[in-house]
Amino acid sequence: MAGVNNRVKITNDIELKDRLVAINRVTKVTKGGRTFSFSAIVVVGNEEGIIGWGLGKAGEVTAAIAKGVESAKKNLTRVPVLKGTVPHEQSAKFGGAEVFIKPASHGTGVVAGGAMRAVLESVGVTDVLAKSKGSSNPHNLVKATIMALGEMRDARMIAQNRGISVEKVFRG
């Protein structure tokens, strides 16, 4: 929806947990030989609807992860989570990666793979069905998953945007 801002300003009272999605060793070939560095994709979230992702690059693995966490903290988004699942089905595409997220009943667990699982667990979703198609590149999967979650709307948000009551959203 146009005009909806889900950005979150970071404050000290938000306790964020970070998850490492992928780490990659990168080689730069120079006249003097090979230079190695590392890139890390990190997802941070408070497991209550706030999520962010970041990319860190450095000569050491720990420094790359730390830079990724700092980058993720600057890129936070709020996502609606209802009773441990998502409000409705949603799909999104980023690059060659396409994701499909569907709500699940209590006790199902997080049925998702790789990078999608890290994002969904960080946002606080405990029961969801998710499928990725196309590219399995973790960069694109993380971005597509966060894009799909960012497009989610619960009944309260819809009522607020339309200027009507929550009951009227359901009854028409």
UniProtKB/Swiss-Prot annotation:
Keyword rRNA-binding included in the entry's annotation: yes
A single BP term in Gene Ontology: translation
Name of a matching Pfam family: Ribosomal_S5
Keyword Ribosomal protein on entry: yes
Family: Belongs to the universal ribosomal protein uS5 family.
NCBIfam families: rpsE_bact (TIGR01021)
Domain characteristics, as noted in the entry: The N-terminal domain interacts with the head of the 30S subunit; the C-terminal domain interacts with the body and contacts protein S4. The interaction surface between S4 and S5 is involved in control of translational fidelity.
Protein's name according to its UniProt entry: Small ribosomal subunit protein uS5
Annotated organism of origin: Bacteroides fragilis (strain ATCC 25285 / DSM 2151 / CCUG 4856 / JCM 11019 / LMG 10263 / NCTC 9343 / Onslow / VPI 2553 / EN-2)
Name of encoding gene: rpsE
